[in-house]
């Protein structure tokens, strides 16, 4: 079964984001889940590449890609603080509406 991680990122350092993600990934893999990466760091998502493509709502672009990846998943794992992050709340609504298993960080 495939799972993605939804986590708040605003106001966090890259290191904090990766640390939280790696911890969650290890827990999920221990439970037998296959991890689908939703941390988009390749060149396609650089500020310059998005500007070239005409992206004006960068957070919405990331959310759209996350929702696309959600379509490949059976479950979504929500990290602490998700209720305070607009994108996480939208991902949660989509996961519930489409019947994915919803998991929460303790």
Where are these regions (language model features)?
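Conserved catalytic or regulatory cores that recognize and/or transform ribose-phosphate-containing ligands
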Residues: 1-106
């Amino acid at each position: 079964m495939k799972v993605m991680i939804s986590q708040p990122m605003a106001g966090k350092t890259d290191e904090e984001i990766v640390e939280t993600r790696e911890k969650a990934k290890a827990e999920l893999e221990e439970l037998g889940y296959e991890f689908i990466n939703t941390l988009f760091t390749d060149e396609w998502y650089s500020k310059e590449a998005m500007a070239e493509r005409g992206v004006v709502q960068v957070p919405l672009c990331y959310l759209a890609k996350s929702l696309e990846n959600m379509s490949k998943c059976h479950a979504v794992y929500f990290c602490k603080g998700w209720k305070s992050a607009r994108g996480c709340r939208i991902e949660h609504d989509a996961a519930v509406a489409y019947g994915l298993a919803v998991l929460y960080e303790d």
